[in-house]
Amino acid sequence: MRWLAMALVSCLAGCPAFAQSGPSFDCAKASNAVERTICKDPELAKADRDMAATYTALAGKLSGPAKDDVVKDQARWIGDRNRGCGADTDGIAPCLKKRYAARTANLRAFADGPYPFISEQSLARSGKLGKITYSYDIGYPRFDGTTADFTAINARFANAAQKAAADATPKGASGVDREQGWTYEQGFRVYRPSAHAVTVAVDFYGYSGGAHGYGATDCTLVDLRTGKAVGPQDAFVSGDDWLKTMVQLVGADLKKQFVDKPGFDEALEPKNLAKLLREPGHYCWQANRLELILNAYEVGPYVSGPFEVDVPYERLKPLLRADGPVALNP
């Protein structure tokens, strides 16, 4: 890993411009199945080139601890990419496409404001117990900054990842006498709703037997000033006006969506919707809008999948706290 970090630093000092048709590295020196797959796929080559350019632009404007952090994180990401996608049972190319999309988006988010010191950690394993073949590939964030105490939020993400890994590993009572294929994949994206807060959106999908798999998106708003996870009640002004407004906006939008895909009518009842909208995991605060994500079974059947409601910040401006984590510029 040390040699890779040094290579990245050297590249920042004077790498030639990336080839316009190939990836950011020399395909003649491709040393593993992941790199060879990238070299053979023009779409992946472009994804690698774009990601590398985004990384180089970010690292080039950083210095000191921030630059050290992003260089080490990039080296770690490349190593995790090789291990995770190299062992992916669904194929290397699909794994790479997802990883590159998320990494490029996160690097752009890191560049949008003060560097947030967020590194990507991973848990990965594959094996077999009885007749069950299983694998998991889990990415989760760690806040490495020193401006606040991030101990609690880091433990929260790490513990959730460890629990997911344990749940994705078959046990003796898991029906090991039947042929099964268990998988679990998890990644995350970072959004910047303001200069002093980030949203971490964790996406996961798994299958461990049964009629179908399971998946969801869970969002966490982190106030970088305090190092704490905060909920909608911390972003909106005090009182219940924000909740009443959200119930009206979300209820009206869902009613329209239910025309095209089935939903639970009882979910639209104000009391039920209010209870759901108090839960912070649905609130994916982004750069210019709030995205409400309601996962399968929460307001509709599994076949309908998740429901999403976008709310521009202009509609919420009177309700947002001036000193809150999502304060808008005047």
Predicted regions span which residues?
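Sec-dependent N-terminal signal peptides
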Residues: W3-A13
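Short amphipathic alpha-helical heptad-repeat segments
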Residues: L44-D48, A66-D73
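Histidine-centered, metal-coordinating catalytic motifs and their short helical/loop contexts
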Residues: D68-G86
